[in-house]
């Protein structure tokens, strides 16, 4: 059963393009090492309908039985991320492929990267599909409601382990560039299957990645290559325009300078979601305080968006 699951996971990597056929044996050996298996007989099994969630569950159950991990969602997530990294191309390969696709079009590049982020299980499709989304018509416009259910609930043992775990300042936060390839620990998620696309915005180094929780359509994160506080200044808007020139099919707002994310410096969030400002239907008048005169602006019948995280 264990060897069948290993073979299926390797085949999944080949089917999705994460792993080239020429690396079948190499990838199999990586997985055997992670699972602490010394023997392999290339089992005869059905490879026609491979469900990633099921294959990973079988491997995780085997890891628990062998005493490799504790049976909790935190340690299972750490371990299956390590398994998926065995299938993954190196960051340089991903960046080169992204650049190749970008020559076709910006959207071709992001389509490739978004698919890779899902195929790698960095974005766990089987959890994201649990999210609830619906719309409600109100007198103020259409209200979009989303309830995020894709973040797993931690069990009490995992919470205690995270509390008692040795504190580390590396990576500095959950969104620093140093997370790429990081194995994780009880109080920090694994990012071995995580890949980042480097960007240059206003002459400075930034990183581009997708959110593992997909709050909105192709929800991505753009973060500073340096762990520095967010500032709202002229350079901020130059960076925003640099991004949307590079990826014109995305929008990119900036977090306010006072916005706090605990130990994380606030990043910028991007998406392909249609926002209320895209729904222009009626005229709205705003006042310019410094002039004391009305400034007519074509605005929308509000389409509101609310997001709740459980």
Predicted region positions:
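A long, hydrophobic alpha-helical segment
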Residues: 248-258
């Amino acid at each position: 059963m264990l060897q069948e699951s290993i073979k299926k996971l390797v085949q999944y990597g080949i089917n999705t393009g994460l792993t080239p056929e020429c690396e079948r044996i190499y990838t199999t050996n990586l997985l055997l090492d992670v699972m602490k298996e010394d023997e392999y007989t290339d089992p005869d099994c059905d490879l026609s309908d491979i469900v990633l969630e099921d294959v990973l569950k079988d491997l995780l159950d085997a890891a628990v039985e062998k005493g490799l991990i504790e049976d909790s969602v935190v340690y299972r997530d750490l371990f299956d991320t390590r398994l998926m990294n065995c299938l993954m191309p190196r960051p340089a390969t991903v960046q080169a492929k992204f650049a190749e696709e970008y020559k076709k079009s910006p959207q071709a590049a992001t389509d490739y990267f978004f698919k890779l982020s899902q195929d790698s299980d960095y974005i766990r499709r089987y959890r994201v599909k649990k999210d609830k989304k619906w719309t409600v018509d109100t007198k103020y416009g259409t209200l979009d409601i989303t309830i995020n259910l894709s973040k797993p609930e931690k069990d009490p043992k995992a919470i205690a382990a995270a509390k008692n775990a040795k504190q580390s300042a590396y990576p500095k936060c959950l969104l620093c560039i140093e997370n790429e390839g990081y194995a994780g620990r009880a109080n920090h998620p694994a990012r071995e299957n995580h890949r980042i696309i480097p960007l240059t915005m206003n002459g400075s180094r930034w990183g581009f990645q997708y959110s593992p929780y997909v709050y909105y359509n192709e929800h991505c994160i753009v973060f500073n290559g340096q762990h520095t506080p967010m500032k709202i200044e002229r350079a901020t808007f130059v960076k925003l325009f640099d991004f949307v020139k590079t990826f014109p099919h995305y929008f990119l707002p900036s977090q306010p300078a006072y916005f706090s994310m605990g130990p994380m410096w606030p990043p910028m969030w991007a998406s392909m979601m249609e926002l209320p400002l895209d729904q222009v239907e009626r005229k709205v008048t705003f006042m310019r305080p410094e002039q004391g005169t009305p400034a007519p602006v074509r605005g929308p019948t509000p389409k509101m968006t609310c997001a709740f995280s459980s």
